[in-house]
Design a protein with these regions (language model features):
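Conserved, well-structured ligand/cofactor-binding cores
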Residues: 1-175
Length: 175
């Protein structure tokens, strides 16, 4: 990969998405991978994953290769807000790298966990923005003493836009 490293938040989201997928038991990996991923997440050790690389339908191979590199004890990680050698951090935390077994390499790297993890973060922030926008819209409505019929139940129930109905309902509740 190239470019800037993913933020620790994004890297952790990738790890969580990967842990979720691998824990389903359909990827041909050993339980040691799941246990090490869990330990890294809990100890706040995140892999150095670069923002640019192959992301797409066949998987996030480049980014997940950087995660796999950490799992085998290679590459670099972020720990205590510092970029460090994985081997040093593993030694400090008494962690053992995984031993890759036959056919396990593909299971470690093939998937869409990068897109999924970053997508989850974006969805979270998008919802926060919607909430803020709704509150600001309500505040403006109050400040200018506008009519509130544009979000009335009578008007919005005639429209077949579920999202609009929900937002109008939330605005009525806020005011």
């Amino acid at each position: 990969g190239v470019g800037n490293p993913l933020s620790p938040q994004s890297a952790k989201a990738v790890m969580l998405a990967r842990l979720n997928t691998l824990s389903l038991g359909k990827s041909g990996i050993h339980p040691s991978v799941i246990f090490l991923l869990k330990e890294l997440i809990n100890k706040d050790v995140t892999p150095l994953i670069f923002e640019h690389g192959g992301v797409g339908a066949s998987g996030d191979l480049v980014q997940l290769a950087h995660l796999a590199l950490v799992l085998i004890g290679e590459g670099e990680v972020f720990y205590k807000n510092k970029r460090r050698n994985t081997k040093d951090v593993f030694a400090e935390l008494n962690l053992e790298p995984i031993k890759v077994h036959i056919r396990e390499g593909l299971g470690l790297m093939n998937g869409t966990s990068t897109m999924t993890g970053i997508g989850i973060i974006n969805a979270y922030y998008s919802r926060k923005l919607v909430d803020i926008s709704l509150k600001l819209s309500c505040a403006i409505n109050e400040i200018v003493k506008a009519y509130d019929d544009h979000f009335s139940e009578a008007l919005n129930s005639t429209k077949r836009h579920e999202g609009q109905q929900k937002m109008a309902s939330r605005m009525r509740e806020s005011l």
